[in-house]
């Protein structure tokens, strides 16, 4: 770890020289990248300085304890040493996270797609519950939340729901929500009080930046159909052909949007989803080819992987990837997801750091 820290501190000095060059302002994109790197490395240096200072205090307290005779002073020093050890441990965890090179996608916004799976109506209702959960979480984080597409079920809830979430740290915290979410509870229609199990799938697609050169879509590769929007049960809710279906012919990816009354707005939303899906498909393909990259993730990120179980009768939520169980499902469903998302991020960073150390050893 010490070797990595020294490498980053040297890089910080280089970045400070580069960013102080007046010519850097002629290249806004480069300046933006350097500014972000400078902020990250500065945080690392500040944390490292705090670790060194705390370890010095700890060392001094231990030396004083070895020579102290007064019982009250001994008790005070022992208490200080215990709290000092806890603080050093906490700072080292922060330092570990900062030592992991950032994912270039960390600053991207995301498109989340929730779909009802096994369980029929109950699964659709749980999609609705999770939509609300993510909406509340986004609000608590100060993120922008946007409905891109929604297909309601006949009894409430959604067969499919697509949302856009934007803000600082969105992708970093939400990326591990991808997978199968299983719910165990007694449906309102159940007269015998039996617990039913159903499931939904969640996809988290980083939304390509406007200047992303990797995602190029040629207009001639698109088949665009327009039709009248319909609501639950199939009834038409608009008398104009405002709904849009876009098919990307080379990949076969199909996106439908019908929530806006404007055909133009529906097309714009459909294109955003299409770009994100095409980009995600390419990333999934690369990950399958690079098994080393796969093993560094928390779980596979596969849509079919069961990642979490929500047991309502026990007020329990379990994340199977890291063995985390909380008996506060009621709070989680109200958008209190920080304990889960932070634990997943920390676990993933620790894995990446370990893999990096193994490669360098």
From Swiss-Prot:
<comment type="similarity">
    <text>Belongs to the prokaryotic/mitochondrial release factor family.</text>
</comment>
<dbReference type="InterPro" id="IPR004373">
    <property type="entry name" value="RF-1"/>
</dbReference>
<protein>
    <recommendedName>
        <fullName>Peptide chain release factor 1</fullName>
    </recommendedName>
</protein>
<dbReference type="InterPro" id="IPR000352">
    <property type="entry name" value="Pep_chain_release_fac_I"/>
</dbReference>
<comment type="function">
    <text>Peptide chain release factor 1 directs the termination of translation in response to the peptide chain termination codons UAG and UAA.</text>
</comment>
<dbReference type="GO" id="GO:0016149">
    <property type="term" value="F:translation release factor activity, codon specific"/>
</dbReference>
<feature type="modified residue" description="N5-methylglutamine">
    <location>
        <position position="235"/>
    </location>
</feature>
<dbReference type="InterPro" id="IPR045853">
    <property type="entry name" value="Pep_chain_release_fac_I_sf"/>
</dbReference>
<keyword id="KW-0963">Cytoplasm</keyword>
<dbReference type="GO" id="GO:0005737">
    <property type="term" value="C:cytoplasm"/>
</dbReference>
<dbReference type="InterPro" id="IPR005139">
    <property type="entry name" value="PCRF"/>
</dbReference>
<dbReference type="Pfam" id="PF03462">
    <property type="entry name" value="PCRF"/>
</dbReference>
<dbReference type="InterPro" id="IPR050057">
    <property type="entry name" value="Prokaryotic/Mito_RF"/>
</dbReference>
<keyword id="KW-0648">Protein biosynthesis</keyword>
<dbReference type="Pfam" id="PF00472">
    <property type="entry name" value="RF-1"/>
</dbReference>
<keyword id="KW-0488">Methylation</keyword>
